[in-house]
Amino acid sequence: MNETMKAEIESQDDELFDLTPSYLKKEIMVLACGNILFADDGFSVHVIEKLNKILTDKEKQKIALVDAGAGAPQQVLTLIDENSKTKKIIVVDVIDWGIKPGEIKIIEKDELPNPKYHRLDSHDWPLAPLLREVAEKYNIEVKVVGCQAKYISEPDVYIGLSEEVEKAVDKAVEIILRELRGD
């Protein structure tokens, strides 16, 4: 077997055993955090669904749309390492910054809160410190497109967004598209 054939076989073996999730093989990740079962907490899911309809197939080759739900964003972020292709993460979530319900706030990495926590589980784990760590350790640009929630029904199930937050979905999509397309 010549050297060219050996190299080709090794390359195929590497691909077979590459366990990197597909969303970490793209330059940009739009990470939706939320749960449609809890009223306005489902904001990000609606944003991701609209982006999925609007983005072209060519754009989707470099942009990963990840609906991580309420508990999985931390797991998604902890999989990032030096082999990840991700250069930018746009997190979409509801926020509580004391602004008007439905108002959109863009939060840069340096503005992320730094909460102290003692208990560690996937529902109470603050995302901001992990976002900051990933951004700094792997030189990834991070932004949060946050929408001030009006009503989060948890633990009660309520499917549907408040009127204010529903109106904010299109605005968030426009902001994200400008960020993705460089408009």
UniProtKB/Swiss-Prot annotation:
Leader sequence residues: none
Coiled-coil region(s): none
Molecular function, one GO term: endopeptidase activity
Superkingdom as given in the UniProt entry: Archaea
Keyword Ubl conjugation in record: no
Gene3D superfamilies given in the database record: HybD-like
Keyword terms, alphabetized: Aspartyl protease, Hydrolase, Protease
GO biological process, one term: protein processing
InterPro entries: Pept_A31_F420-red_hyd_d, Pept_HybD-like_dom_sf, Peptidase_A31
Classification via PANTHER family: HYDROGENASE 1 MATURATION PROTEASE, HYDROGENASE 2 MATURATION PROTEASE
Similarity remark: Belongs to the peptidase A31 family.
Name assigned to this protein: Coenzyme F420 hydrogenase subunit delta
Species this protein is from: Methanocaldococcus jannaschii (strain ATCC 43067 / DSM 2661 / JAL-1 / JCM 10045 / NBRC 100440)
